[in-house]
UniProtKB/Swiss-Prot annotation:
Name this protein carries in UniProt: Protein Smg
Protein's organism: Serratia proteamaculans (strain 568)
HAMAP family per record: Smg
One Pfam family per UniProt: DUF494
PANTHER family (UniProt xref): PROTEIN SMG
Family assignment from sequence similarity: Belongs to the Smg family.
Coiled coil (UniProt feature): none
Top-level taxon in the UniProt lineage: Bacteria
Length: 157
C-alpha cells in the first residue's frame, strides 16, 4: 500500500494538485502500472481517512489535549515509530513544521499503514503527504519538503 501512496503522491498529487481524477480510472491506471488492486483500494481508503481527519469530529483525541503536554506513545506506536522517528516528530514540532493536531494526524496515518517495515524515510514521506493535504499549511509543507530533499541530496554527493 505504501508503494501505491508514494506513486500517487509523486505522479498525480504532487505534480498536478488541481487535477481531478475519476477513482475508477485511477484504479485502472494503477493496476496497469503493476499495483495489486487490494493495495490500490487500501491506499485510496488511507487517503480518504486522511481527508476525514481534517474534519475534526472524526478525530476527537485532538480536542482536549494540552499543547504543553508531552506525547506518550502506545506500545504499538513505539514499535512502529522507533526512537529516531519519535525524535524526528519532536524535532518537527520544535521547528513548528508540525503542531499537536498535525502530529496526531501523522501518527494516525502511520499506524494505518500495512507495512511491516517502517523507517525514518517513510515517516518523512507520510509527514509530507499529510501536510500537503491540509489547506493553509503550505509553509509547513515547503519546510518539510526542503528537509526531505536537502537530506536526500546530501547522500548523492
Amino acid at each position: 500500500m505504501f508503494d501505491v501512496l508514494m506513486y500517487l503522491f509523486e505522479t498525480y498529487i504532487h505534480n498536478e494538485p488541481e487535477m481531478r481524477v475519476d477513482q475508477d480510472q485511477l484504479t485502472d491506471d494503477l493496476a496497469q502500472a503493476g499495483f495489486h488492486r487490494d493495495d490500490i483500494y487500501n491506499a485510496l481508503n488511507w487517503l480518504e481517512k486522511l481527508a476525514d481527519l481534517q474534519e475534526g469530529e472524526n478525530a476527537p483525541y485532538f480536542m482536549d489535549a494540552d499543547p504543553l503536554a508531552m506525547r506518550i506513545y502506545t506500545e504499538e506506536e513505539g514499535v512502529r515509530l522507533d526512537a529516531s522517528c519519535r525524535g524526528f516528530l519532536l524535532f518537527l514540532e520544535q521547528i513548528q513544521v508540525l503542531n499537536l493536531e498535525t502530529r496526531e494526524m501523522v501518527i494516525d496515518r502511520v499506524m494505518a499503514l500495512d507495512n511491516t517495515e517502517f523507517d525514518l524515510e517513510d515517516l518523512k514521506w507520510v509527514v509530507l503527504m499529510v501536510l500537503f493535504n491540509i489547506p493553509g499549511y503550505e509553509s509547513a509543507y515547503q519546510q518539510m519538503e526542503e528537509l526531505l530533499f536537502e537530506v536526500n541530496e546530501g547522500y548523492l554527493h
